[in-house]
Amino acid sequence: MESKIRNYYAVKVTGGQEVSVGLMLEERAKTNNIPEIYSIIVPPGLKGYVIVEASGPHVVKLLIAGIRHVRGIAQGLVPKDHIVKMVSKKVTGPTIKEGDLVEVVSGPFRGMQAQVVKVTEGKGEVVLNILESAFPLQVTIPVDQVKPVKKT
């Protein structure tokens, strides 16, 4: 048996409707039992497009026919390395180390200064010692809720 050819096609959609169109395409692929659709990707940073992994453009045209907010298929194929870049997790933001002085930017401790006691990178959390409290107070909050004030 031949190996299935998998190509990525960009489907043009109305801006802001990417998630709803992606869900409608998924539902249609399931109800119409279209096995040539392998995946439907809604890239977070790409406005106005939904990526469909399929065996050919005729399958994608069959899938998108009559769906609201779909404007057509973009010409050509999307290279696989572009897809990997779009969906891979990007490490952003400043790195915070133990002993750094930080300010809490959201949550119940917003605006308070704290010292970093421990950083758990796997969970994306930091354990802080709040400096502005009357007694020693340690809290664990997500790393995106703090910003560095002073490095040690």
Curated annotation (Swiss-Prot):
Cited Pfam families: KOW (PF00467), Spt5-NGN (PF03439)
Biological processes per GO annotation: regulation of DNA-templated transcription; transcription elongation-coupled chromatin remodeling
Residues in KOW domain copies: 98-127
Keywords in alphabetical order: Transcription, Transcription regulation
GO cellular component, one term: ribosome
Cited InterPro entries: KOW, NGN-domain, NGN-like_dom, NGN_dom_sf, Rib_uL2_dom2, Ribosomal_uL24_CS, Spt5_arc, Translation_prot_SH3-like_sf
Known role: Stimulates transcription elongation.
Protein's recorded name: Transcription elongation factor Spt5
Organism whose genome encodes this protein: Acidianus ambivalens
